[in-house]
């Protein structure tokens, strides 16, 4: 019984250490694709969606 508890505790410590190492090594730039610096079409679509959402919200009241 005591050996099983020690093994479980050791496994828990190893898992916690592995997770903390993964958090320390995380990079926010990982996996990003090249984005077009001209974001005007995206801004236009975002504003258009907002306008339509406001219209729909106004109709439901």
Curated annotation (Swiss-Prot):
Keywords: Amidation, Cleavage on pair of basic residues, Disulfide bond, Flight, Hormone, Neuropeptide, Pyrrolidone carboxylic acid, Secreted, Signal
Gene Ontology molecular function: hormone activity
Subcellular location: Secreted
Range of residues in the leader sequence: 1-22
This protein's GO CC annotations: extracellular region
GO biological process: flight behavior; neuropeptide signaling pathway
Domain of life: Eukaryota
List of residues that carry Pyrrolidone carboxylic acid: 23
PTM-bearing positions, type Tryptophan amide: 30
InterPro entries recorded: Adipokinetic_hormone_CS (IPR002047)
Family membership: Belongs to the AKH/HRTH/RPCH family.
Function in brief: This hormone, released from cells in the corpora cardiaca, causes release of diglycerides from the fat body and stimulation of muscles to use these diglycerides as an energy source during energy-demanding processes.
Subunit structure: Adipokinetic hormone precursor-related peptide (APRP) can form three type of disulfide-bond dimers: p1 (alpha-alpha), p2 (alpha-beta), and p3 (beta-beta).
Protein name: Adipokinetic prohormone type 2
Organism: Schistocerca nitens (Vagrant locust)
Organismal lineage: Eukaryota, Metazoa, Ecdysozoa, Arthropoda, Hexapoda
